[in-house]
């Protein structure tokens, strides 16, 4: 590594979000928008010459990102080379750099004794700089194999499959049942966490590279699978996980109780259809809101509700409160099961002084005017 003593000399410094009091008034991304490149170079120097980089092991990055390599390249101000290494393993680092929970940081060797390297921040800065500098462009395919492939579903898996198959020279057509391409990238992750302009930017690149996209088409209904088999040499099913985890209890079917997928999708679609003006039919405006579930989806629901202006908001967590640090039965390099406060909780605390209420027994009965369950 370029600076072998970096992890001894420098503390972890994480890039900050926009101020809470400002960001709760809009649906823009919570990120500040500008990267402190010199600070990120220093943070890259904290990456150790650890021998076995657990950050890209089974407990770390699931796509085997070459993390130590691009950390060191960033430290040496070789951003374009860092982008080249990042794109070796990651089709869409602008997505993962925003929404990935960063298991790589949980298994960082430095994390045994000190706060981990800011891998996620560095990844996002690399790809954002790549777009800003014009380094990321459509990669035209010069030779075609003559084979045709249908991809069913346009979420992250479908887009990645389409990208890989297209670069191999196959002609790819992606079918999406919704009115917009992107799957859960478009309709599952709130705008403030993943701006839809970021999603559209990548889709436009893929389209320019020769991938064809078909929306409003439900395979099995609008087109039979036998028809696809007749038209294509191969079919890839990447249909996603849009079915909600239910929480059966008395009054479950009462009006005003919604699964997170329905709630988040309605909000995002309303914003996209109405020029970023929320006309969500499930709006929490003026209501007493309970969000059941305190994980990533829960905090997305909290953040969405806060922007809609609820009368009150309470968050229930079904699990008992985890420890602040690792427990003995949760050793490194496993993902650290610890108490976390994310952007939505921070916003709710600012507005309502939110106290996360932990319960160990299942919810028995709904007796409220408005609830979103995010298990």
Predicted regions mapped to residue ranges:
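Iron-sulfur (Fe-S) cluster-binding segments and ferredoxin-like electron-carrier domains
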Residues: 5-29, 54-81, 103-128
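Glycine-rich phosphate/pyrophosphate-binding loop
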Residues: 16-37, 270-273, 280, 369
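Gly-rich Lys/Arg/Thr-decorated short loops/hinges at beta-loop-alpha junctions or inter-strand turns
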Residues: 21-23, 180-187, 253
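Immediate flanking context of iron-sulfur cluster ligation sites
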Residues: 32-56, 79-103
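Rossmann-like dinucleotide/flavin-binding elements
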Residues: 45, 151-175, 214-224, 229, ...
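FAD-binding core/adjacent interface of flavoenzyme oxidoreductases
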Residues: 70, 93-152, 167-168, 199, ...
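N-terminal Rossmann-like dinucleotide/flavin-binding domain of flavoprotein oxidoreductases
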Residues: 83-90, 122, 185-233, 337-360
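Single conserved hydrophobic/aromatic residue that forms the stacking wall/gate
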Residues: 357-375
